[in-house]
Amino acid sequence: MTEKDADSGSDLVDAFLSDAYLNTEELRKDGPFSPDEFLVSKRFLGLDGLVNELSRLFEQVNNELMLLVKDNYQDFVHLGSRMKSGNTKVSTLISSIHRSEEQLKNSKQSLIGHSTEIQNNLKHKQDVENEKLIASNLLLLDQILKFLKSNDSSHPLWLESLNNAQRLCDTYKDHPWVQSISPTLINYIKH
């Protein structure tokens, strides 16, 4: 290696470490910052040099940020107060949402209670309807028995009435009144 080559290599190292090579203006170019492009442009710089350059750039950006805050302090304070006001509004909204959720839970519980009550009432109504049907059929059976008692077997509707009475007795055979009149019906069948 000649002295000229050594000087040339030394100049190259000096160029890499100089502010001319580590130009921060490239960070200010239009468009988004590309870490890949930055690292490719610094590929000949050693790791320590890259760390030093990044530390220096960080300090520079930090100082510029502080200068911006200092120059625009009133705007910065106003931004902080707007953020605080926004946080207050968000807190108010959150508490309103929590109250609404609680009201919805209470409404849901109330709705479930009303739904259960309605189902019970519908079941009771159905039971009452069934009882009315039983009572109506038992009244019909009583009328049929009175008809059978007051008419003899030669009447044209007598046999049909007897069959209807038997059908009703079979349907309600477990009812106490039907059990009590079964002997009477058996007597009519024997005639």
Swiss-Prot record:
Any single Pfam family the record assigns to this protein: COG2_N
Biological processes annotated in GO: endoplasmic reticulum to Golgi vesicle-mediated transport; Golgi organization; intracellular protein transport; retrograde transport, vesicle recycling within Golgi
Compartments, as annotated in UniProt: Golgi apparatus membrane; Nucleus
Predominant localisation class: Golgi
Topology class, membrane: Peripheral membrane protein
GO-annotated cellular components: cytosol; Golgi membrane; Golgi transport complex; nucleus
Cited InterPro entries: COG2, COG_su2_N
Keyword list, A-Z: Golgi apparatus, Membrane, Nucleus, Protein transport, Transport
Family: Belongs to the COG2 family.
PANTHER family documented for this protein: CONSERVED OLIGOMERIC GOLGI COMPLEX COMPONENT 2, CONSERVED OLIGOMERIC GOLGI COMPLEX SUBUNIT 2
Role: Required for normal Golgi morphology and function.
Subunit structure: Component of the conserved oligomeric Golgi complex which is composed of eight different subunits and is required for normal Golgi morphology and localization.
Stated name of the protein: Conserved oligomeric Golgi complex subunit 2
Organism: Schizosaccharomyces pombe (strain 972 / ATCC 24843) (Fission yeast)
The encoding gene: cog2
